[in-house]
Amino acid sequence: IVLQNEHIYILDKKQATIFIFTHNGKYQNKIANQGRAPGEYLSISDFEVYDSHVYCLSRTNQKIFKYDTNGVFQNTIQVNDWYDCFHIQNDSTIYLFSDYSNNQLYNYVVYNPITKEIINRLDKFKKNQGFSFEYSPFHCLDSNLLVSEQYEHTIFSLTSQEKKPLYSFIFNTSDQIPPFIYTDREKTYHFLQGKETLRRIKGLYISQGTLNIVYSIFYKNSGIK
């Protein structure tokens, strides 16, 4: 869900459709262009609203599709790899994210859509694991871009030059994250079924100078909370 310019944008991944509502909940329009023709996508993995346009990332197509708020296709940005999520920082900087599952073998790729060049690659891994949790790690806090990843107890700051630890938290859960978290995501997923551990830090916001986090933990007696 994205709230911007007095509008509410909601992605329905199953229908590959973005529904657009006014700020008071009145339906206004939708972007529903699933298909194989020019300007159509096979799926929507993630979307962003930037500069009064809607950008839709399709992992399957390896493209970002740009539409106006009436659903009229504008153009595409070819990203040429498997990415789950993205963040548009400005006109010349897009952060692309893949959870250990692309051929670049970097979790973060910084791309300039104007020059069509890769600015930098960050957070290297050894093997394309082909397994995705389908979440966005990106959080914009004031003028800073922060990221939180699946099972990670640490929040990182991200720039085009580096990813570095910023905050770390201790969660008193009865089970621990296994050491193979970074080398085998699918094995980690199955190993942690039914175990009491952090799943993900899902949201960040600052109130009266205090950092607040929203997170999910699986509890053995009550499920994910």
Write out the residue ranges for each language-model feature.
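Eukaryotic scaffold repeat domains enriched in small/polar residues
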Residues: 1-225
